[in-house]
From Swiss-Prot:
InterPro entries listed in its UniProt record: P-loop_NTPase, RapZ-like, RapZ-like_N, RapZ_C
Residues the entry annotates as binding ATP: 8-15
Keyword Nucleotide-binding: yes
Disulfide bridge map: none
Source organism superkingdom: Bacteria
Name this protein carries in UniProt: Nucleotide-binding protein NMCC_0698
Molecular-function GO terms, alphabetical: ATP binding; GTP binding
PANTHER family recorded: RNASE ADAPTER PROTEIN RAPZ
Amino acid sequence: MKIVLISGLSGSGKSVALRQMEDSGYFCVDNLPLEMLPALVSYHIERADETELAVSVDVRSGIDIGQAREQIAYLRGLGHRVEVLFVEAEESVLVRRFSETRRGHPLSNQDMTLLESLKKEREWLFPLKEIAYCIDTSKMNAQQLRHAVRQWLKVERTGLLVILESFGFKYGVPNNADFMFDMRSLPNPYYDPELRPYTGMDKPVWDYLDGQPLVQEMVDDIEKFLTHWLPRLEDESRSYVTVAIGCTGGQHRSVYVVEKLARRLKGRYELLIRHRQAQNLPSR
């Protein structure tokens, strides 16, 4: 049976993610105490219910991170496929969301401010984030988060999932990257008026960057680095690795390099491609 644990920071969109799981056909349970998870799985099996499970766990349920990882290992040992989805956002965004909704943080009390509560929650959940697929919702609305969850669900993962993500430095760096590479030293198609309207997925930009030796050297070096280190991470039983590729605006060079690496790594790893600035790319 496939079991998805959804966790993350309060205010980051866990409820939206759980609703998308329900819309995708999962049997969903919100705020389940972890010690009850094996009983829920057993009950589900006894009912001969083939519906996949999605369970939200967070600080409201008094989550013990050590226990969470033990429960995951236990269920995997029984043959279940257990995935972890972690939803997060930047601190300033979370503060704004709490201000807009006027809701209190689950850890807030007279002795702890909202910022202190957010910091404590982030530190508390970090060990769970380490083994999870992470979605940063800082620049997402609910519809975009739902789309990101649907894209993740489409990936049939049997081994290490490598997330290749392009981004623009001027919009901020992703905070969940395991490896980050900077493409700003490469020739920039943006300065060619004929190429500016295109993106790194379009043939004119591909033809231009394919003809740049420095670009090809960079792609070769990144591929060599990943080929060397990804097997080591896989040996450590890592489930997900995020490789972030950045350029100035996230339109040309980073998109091209991500697409190029995807072609080279295809067949060796399960891949998920994310273009972080997709909503900012020109439409033609």
